[in-house]
Every structure is written in C-alpha cells, then in structure tokens.
A protein has these predicted regions:
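Amphipathic alpha-helical coiled-coil segments with heptad-repeat character
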Residues: 1-4, 8, 46, 77, ...
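Short terminal alpha-helical segments
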Residues: 1-33, 88-95
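Charged, low-complexity surface segments at secondary-structure and domain boundaries
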Residues: 11-16, 37-38, 72-80
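Amphipathic alpha-helical interaction modules
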Residues: 19-65
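Amphipathic alpha-helical binding modules
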Residues: 70-103
Length: 103
C-alpha cells in the first residue's frame, strides 16, 4: 500500500504540473515527467493500472534519443498538440483511477 500511496502522490504532483503549470502542454508534460519517473508500474496495485502506467510512460518516451537530448525530449519534439493533450489527459485519468481504487 505504501508504494501505491507514493505513486498517488507522484501522480498528483504530475497532474498539478499539467493543470496549473505554465508553458505549453509539451513543457508541462516535461515537468510532469520529473514526477512520473520516480514511480514504476510495480507501484500500481492493480494490473489494469500497471498496464496504463506502462503505456503512458511508453508514449512519453517512444522516440529514440538523438545526441544528449534523451527519449522524452525526442518524443515531445515530434508529438502534435492533440497527442500531447491526450498524454496529459491520460496522466490525469490515471491519477483519478488510482485515487478511486485507494479510497
């Protein structure tokens, strides 16, 4: 349960960065990633949520790194606005789903 509560905290921080942060959606996704990278699928107490988290992280790091930029930056450089919004929505949805499960 402790891992799940920590995951909920990090997802809350990521959702907050998306909802109240400044900058473009891509910039806010970058900030949200700094919280998400601290947790892993194993921190999710439910198989469906583990899969959703793994897919989310895969969507954020789908592009190969070029030079020193890293996979996240490479991915954020090629996603369009709609894709970025969908990823952001998935983060917020995962936060709410985990919160409901832990109630």
């Amino acid at each position: 349960m402790t891992d799940a509560l920590y995951a909920l905290e990090k997802l809350a921080d990521a959702a907050d960065a998306l909802e109240t942060g400044t900058g473009s959606v891509r910039e806010r996704l970058f900030e949200a990633f700094t919280d998400l990278v601290r947790i892993g699928p194993e921190d999710m107490p439910d198989g469906e949520l583990r899969l959703a988290f793994a897919e989310l992280m895969g969507a954020l790091t789908s592009e190969e790194a070029k030079g020193t930029e890293g996979r996240l930056v490479a991915t954020l450089m090629i996603v369009d606005e709609e894709q970025a919004q969908n990823i952001a929505r998935a983060i917020v949805d995962l936060y709410h789903a985990l919160g409901r499960l832990l109630r």
